[in-house]
C-alpha cells in the first residue's frame, strides 16, 4: 500500500508540474494528525515524509491539522482558516444548532497561504475522511450562508458570508468513503473505544495527541491520564449529534452529505480507491 501511495504521489506531482505550480494541500483523515504533531512519525508517509518528497521536486506543500474526530463542516472551516489566516468561525447558525463555541479563542492562525484566492488556487489531496472534508470545503467556498433561514442576514465570517469561486483547482481523494462505511459502526459500537485508541496512545505518549474538541468545550485536563481522557470523550454528548465524524462517515451521514456536496464544474476530481480482505 505504501509503495502504491508513494508512486501515486510522484506521478501526481509530475502531472502538476506539467500544468502549473499551485500549492498542494494535504488533509488527513479520521484520527489523523498534522505535521510534527507526532514527533518524527508522519501521517503522510510514516517514517518518511511524502510532503518533504514533494517539496524536493519544487512544489509548495501545506500539511493541515484539523479535528481528528470532528465533523466535515468543522474540519473544513478549520482548514480554511489554517490556510487563509484569522480566527476560526464555525458560523453563527451552525454553532447555535449544535451548541458549540463559534469562535474558539485558541484557534487563531497566521495563515499558511494568505494570498489564497481565485488567482492563487490550490490542489487538495485528502486521505480517507480528508476527501470528504475537501469536498465540504469546496461547498462552503461556493455558497453564501445566512444566520437564519428565510432572512437576508449573512454570516459574518469571511468564509461563510460570501462566495469564493475557483479557489480550488483539483480535489484528489484517496480511500475516501464518499458513500459511507460500516466501519464506523465497528469503531463506535462493536469495539470498545479504549481498545480502538490504545495503539495510538501507546505511540504518542501522554500529552502528544489532542482530539481537538475545544469548540465542544472539551479538552484534556492537567495531569489527566489517557484512560480517563478517553473515557470522558467516549461519554461526550457530541457523539449523539450529527456534527461529528461518526455520523459523516456512516452510510446515512454520507448520503446526507452527498445531497449537498455536488461536484463543481471548476474543479478537477480524482478518486483513488483501495480494498482490503481479512
Q: Model-flagged regions — what are they?
A:
Residues 1-4, 190:
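Structural motif marking the loop-to-transmembrane transition
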Residues 3-15:
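Sec-dependent N-terminal signal peptides
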Residues 18-176, 180-195:
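N-terminal non-catalytic accessory region
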Residues 16, 58, 209-211:
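Intrinsic-disorder/low-complexity regions
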Residues 139-278:
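Helical cap/lid subdomain of alpha/beta-hydrolase-fold lipid enzymes
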Residues 9-12, 84, 233:
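Generic alpha-helical secondary structure signal
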Amino acid at each position: 500500500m505504501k509503495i502504491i501511495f508513494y508512486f501515486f504521489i510522484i506521478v501526481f506531482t509530475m502531472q502538476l508540474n506539467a500544468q502549473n505550480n499551485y500549492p498542494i494541500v494535504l488533509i488527513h483523515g479520521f484520527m489523523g494528525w498534522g505535521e510534527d504533531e507526532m514527533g518524527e512519525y508522519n501521517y503522510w508517509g510514516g517514517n518518511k515524509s511524502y510532503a518533504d518528497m514533494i517539496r524536493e521536486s519544487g512544489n509548495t506543500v501545506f500539511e493541515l491539522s484539523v479535528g481528528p474526530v470532528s465533523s466535515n463542516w468543522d474540519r473544513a472551516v478549520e482548514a480554511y482558516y489554517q490556510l487563509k489566516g484569522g480566527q476560526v468561525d464555525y458560523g453563527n447558525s451552525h454553532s447555535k444548532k449544535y451548541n458549540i463555541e463559534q469562535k474558539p479563542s485558541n484557534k487563531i492562525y497566521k495563515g499558511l497561504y494568505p494570498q489564497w484566492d481565485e488567482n492563487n488556487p490550490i490542489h487538495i489531496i485528502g486521505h480517507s475522511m480528508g476527501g470528504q472534508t475537501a469536498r465540504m470545503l469546496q461547498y462552503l467556498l461556493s455558497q453564501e450562508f445566512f444566520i437564519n433561514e428565510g432572512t437576508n442576514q449573512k454570516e459574518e465570517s469571511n468564509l461563510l458570508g460570501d462566495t469564493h469561486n475557483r479557489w480550488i483547482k483539483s480535489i484528489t481523494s484517496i480511500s475516501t468513503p464518499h458513500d459511507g462505511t460500516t466501519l464506523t459502526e465497528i469503531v463506535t459500537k462493536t469495539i470498545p473505544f479504549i481498545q480502538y485508541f490504545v495503539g495510538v496512545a501507546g505511540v504518542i505518549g501522554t500529552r502528544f495527541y489532542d482530539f481537538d474538541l475545544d469548540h465542544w468545550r472539551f479538552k484534556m485536563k492537567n495531569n489527566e491520564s489517557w484512560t480517563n481522557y478517553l473515557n470522558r470523550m467516549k461519554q461526550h454528548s457530541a457523539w449523539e449529534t450529527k456534527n461529528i465524524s461518526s455520523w459523516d462517515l456512516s452510510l446515512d451521514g454520507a448520503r446526507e452529505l452527498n445531497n449537498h456536496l455536488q461536484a463543481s464544474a471548476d474543479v478537477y476530481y480524482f478518486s483513488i480507491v483501495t480494498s482490503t480482505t481479512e
